[in-house]
Swiss-Prot record:
Protein name: Immediate-early protein ICP-46
Keywords noted in UniProt: Early protein
Family: Belongs to the IIV-6 393L family.
């Protein structure tokens, strides 16, 4: 039996097939049910191929689109309210990929603010009804909407520096189907960007188009056949960066992982440093911290050395118990065999060795961005200290 990721509230259940089962259940993605009734259906899991479409697929029978990076935000009306979902969660309030909690919602709202500007648009920073108000004014309650929001914090390979909103499809629950020939003009006259199909006559034209893509701008090509099966074709340049990027949401965590992978890791690091402007500096800082950590544990072999409170007991035992002369090898092996979670916790525990401002060691994103007033209102820290700053009156 399939083990779907689910979330339930107010009588609705959203289901999504995990990545390792997506090829078996491609349509189980942001599938929202109320009992046996389909309320909303997200876009299906794409069948991913590298450098060429699957053999036998008739391109002339498919819709062809450039693919873009971004987070999917699903919007629909049900039970007297607007719902804003990810593919796995019925609420986007705290959903994020690599950045701080709530980054999906933050990016979505920021894009709407830039685009929707008339006398009905939101003006009060403290009004939390902005998204429902936007939907009431601009969306059709009989349709569901699949938006893609891109935020530089959430980028994988593409290097766009501005937030961007696209409408990918609408969903008609009466026919249980998606429409890709859609449009959305806001009450202020602004048109939301909708990707348009590309006219490619044959496989030769398709491959030429794929190979000419800039991985800093687009993420391959999506093919949609007559049965609404999605195929995502990735060009070689994009896959090279994607392989180096790995499945780590945070670029810094990926760097720490690659540092322990020998020649293969070094090759991936070079790719990342070539594509991400901040990667080389992050890499140099990470290597420096790693060497400081190693040296602190090597110092334990000195007669007058004393352990520090932030040191890991297990690694201290390994260093003191190993054969003389093998200490560095044992430390390297210890770091190499850590899981991602263990490595992240380890570097956080040793953050004091980074010197000065060491917040980058434990930050939630490669580059920690300053909080906006919206962040303080909608995503206050648990201790609410930042919120207090909003109401301080200074002479």
């Amino acid at each position: 039996m399939a083990n779907f990721v689910t979330d339930s509230r107010n009588g609705l259940t959203i289901s999504c097939a995990p990545q390792d089962q997506s090829h078996l259940h491609p349509t189980i993605r942001a599938l929202v049910m109320e009992g046996d009734s389909v309320i909303f259906r997200g876009l299906p899991h794409p069948d991913i191929h590298r450098e060429a479409p699957p053999a036998g697929l008739r391109l002339k029978d498919c819709l062809v689109y450039d693919s873009y990076e971004g987070a999917l935000v699903n919007v629909f009306w049900h039970g007297g309210q607007w719902w804003f979902c990810t593919n796995k969660k019925l609420s986007i309030d705290r959903a994020s990929w690599s950045a701080s909690p709530g980054s999906f919602k933050r990016a979505f709202v920021n894009c709407l603010r830039k685009m929707w500007r008339d006398d009905r648009s939101w003006a009060d920073l403290f009004d939390r009804s902005y998204m429902p108000s936007f939907c009431d004014a601009n969306l059709d309650k009989d349709l569901g909407y699949v938006f893609m929001v891109f935020d530089p914090e959430e980028r994988i390979v593409c290097s766009d520096t501005e937030q961007r909103l696209r409408l990918l499809a609408t969903f008609d629950r009466c026919t249980n189907s998606h429409s890709y020939e859609c449009s959305l003009t806001l009450t202020c006259g602004t048109e939301v960007e909708v990707p348009r199909p590309i006219c490619l006559k044959n496989e030769r034209e398709f491959l030429l188009h794929l190979r000419s893509q800039d991985p800093c701008r687009v993420a391959g090509v999506v093919l949609i056949d007559a049965l609404d099966i999605h195929y995502k074709i990735l060009p070689s340049e994009y896959t090279k960066v994607l392989d180096a990027r790995g499945e780590q949401p945070r670029l810094l965590n990926r760097m720490f992982q690659l540092m322990e992978m020998g020649p293969e890791g070094e090759a991936h690091i070079e790719v990342l440093c070539r594509y991400f402007s901040d990667a080389r500096v992050a890499m140099e800082r990470a290597w420096d911290v790693r060497e400081r950590i190693v040296q602190c544990y090597l110092d334990l072999t000195e007669p007058d050395s004393e352990p520090q409170v932030w040191m890991t007991r297990r690694l201290m035992e390994i260093v003191r118990g190993c054969r003389p002369g093998t200490e560095r090898t044992m430390i390297d092996e210890f770091l190499r065999t850590m899981t991602t979670g263990q490595r992240k916790a380890f570097y956080k525990k040793h953050a004091c060795l980074a010197g000065g401002d060491n917040a980058w060691i434990s930050s939630d994103a490669p580059i920690k961005q300053a909080k906006t007033v919206q962040d303080l209102v909608e995503f206050p820290d648990d201790n609410c200290q930042d919120m207090d700053e909003l109401f301080v009156v200074r002479a």
